[in-house]
Amino acid sequence: MPLLDIEGHLHSAQLIDEEGRKRFLKGKLGESFFTTQELSNAQVIGIAEGVATALSVTQVEGFPVVAAMSCTRFRTIVPLIKKHYPQAQIIVLGDCGHGEAEAKSVALLNNVPFVSPSFSEEQIALFKKLTRTTNSPTDFNDYYVVKGILYE
């Protein structure tokens, strides 16, 4: 996945192997991010932690989503996108668990909405069955899988 700055210059890329392991090419992440669609005329822009969530939300909801590439990068990416796209409503799309507090904090700090999925015990069990793992669901990609909108 290419990681571009606000002007479209390539800074790095995230590689994901067949086992789902992620790594970045050498380069400076700085203010770079991945985006699912052009942002310049967007009325709504989501900002997610990772690429899977960004792609899933765009596919289902139809608006562009930026992947910050980690929860700690929300502090850089949210104000950057808000500043450069003042016409758009910015929505922070948090994951459940580890990065949720960071995402909420950044959304509050930047006066933008925060949303994250929630899962019932039944949905957690269904997710584990559908994905044949012991992992619990954590993000909107997982939410759409559980809801039967996307398939793992």
Predicted regions and their residues:
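Phosphate-handling DNA/RNA-contact segment within nucleic-acid enzymes
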Residues: M1-Y85
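TOPRIM fold recognition
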Residues: Q43, L55-E152
